[in-house]
UniProtKB/Swiss-Prot annotation:
Record GO cellular component, one term: cytosolic small ribosomal subunit
Protein name: Small ribosomal subunit protein uS2
Ribosomal protein recorded as keyword: yes
Family note: Belongs to the universal ribosomal protein uS2 family.
Gene Ontology process terms (BP): translation
Listed NCBIfam families: rpsB_bact
Pfam families: Ribosomal_S2
Organism lineage string: Bacteria, Bacillati, Bacillota, Tissierellia, Tissierellales
Organism the protein comes from: Finegoldia magna (strain ATCC 29328 / DSM 20472 / WAL 2508) (Peptostreptococcus magnus)
Record's keyword terms, sorted: Ribonucleoprotein, Ribosomal protein
Matches recorded under PROSITE patterns: RIBOSOMAL_S2_1, RIBOSOMAL_S2_2
InterPro entries: Ribosomal_uS2, Ribosomal_uS2_bac/mit/plastid, Ribosomal_uS2_CS, Ribosomal_uS2_flav_dom_sf
Disordered: annotated segments: 224-269
GO molecular function, one term: structural constituent of ribosome
Length: 269
């Protein structure tokens, strides 16, 4: 049974791609049809790719690896931060600073500075300083926390990156490739799936879609770290407790009919 059902993907709007004039031909293998100028993603392909990504991330974490969740576009920020925290991993949700991976030694000095500022507040140092200086230090800490807070506890290179929209996060993907770090991520119809080790075709502009796919990857981390007494318990909340297969839930004919009858608008930017 798949880690996420096709029905859940449909309900979250994962199947809505970009406008047909904004597409990457390399995504053609993941496209089901076109509807009102919008590409419709083949969710049967999405199911397979998310299963592959889930197993891949789970196995990496089970071997002691760590995941860096990356998503700085508005639609992805909350899901990236929430799900990374839920599974105890690292994240970048505000801004990718050039060199976060390839110049980590320098980035690490800024992280150490952030830790130092927190220590100064906790040990009472702030109480001994003039208010103006404390205000300056607090502003410095807020800026560092915004950009580096999600990787404060990252003491080594991540074993894998999970990205939302590799076109947006091209610098992160490029740095990972330089260092030989595998990348898994959500690719919409305007992206190049060949940039990733495992590409999950899906809507990267709809908050619900991003949340569903990101939470599934977080579940893979949780399974690897904690194990599961009941395999159904750690799947996404939207996963139905059923013994029906995805094909029985939503067949290709059902999907086509859904697309033809759907009046839902795409979350296209």
């Amino acid at each position: 049974m798949s880690v996420v059902s096709m029905k859940s993907l449909l309900e979250a709007g994962v199947h809505f791609g970009h406008q047909t004039r904004r597409w990457n031909p390399k995504m053609s293998k993941f496209i089901f049809t076109e509807r009102n100028g919008i590409y419709i993603i083949d969710l049967q392909k999405t199911v397979k790719q998310i299963d592959d990504a889930y197993n891949y991330v789970r196995d990496i974490v089970a071997d002691g690896g760590e995941v860096l969740f990356v998503g700085t576009k508005k639609q992805a920020q909350e899901a990236i931060e929430t799900e990374a925290k839920r599974c105890g991993q690292h994240f970048v949700s505000q801004r990718w600073l050039g060199g976060m991976l390839t110049n980590y030694k320098t980035i690490k000095t800024r992280i150490n500075r952030l830790h130092k500022l927190y220590e100064m507040e906790e040990d009472g140092t702030f109480d001994l300083l003039p208010k103006k200086e404390v205000s300056q230090l607090e502003r410095e800490r807020e800026k560092l926390e915004k950009n580096l807070g999600g990787i404060r506890k990252m003491n080594k290179m991540p074993s894998v990156l999970f990205v939302v929209d590799p076109k947006k996060e091209y610098i992160a993907v490029h740095e990972a490739k330089i260092l030989g770090i595998p990348v898994v991520g959500i690719v919409d119809t305007n992206c190049d799936p060949d940039e990733l080790d495992i590409a999950i075709p899906g809507n990267d502009d709809a908050i619900r879609a991003v949340k569903l796919l990101t939470s599934t990857i977080a579940d893979a981390v949780i399974e690897a770290n904690q194990g599961r007494e009941d395999s159904e318990d750690v799947y996404s909340e939207t996963e139905n407790d059923t013994e029906e297969t995805d094909e029985e839930l939503v067949s290709e004919e059902d999907l086509k009919e859904f697309v033809e009858n759907s009046e839902e608008e795409s979350d296209e930017e």
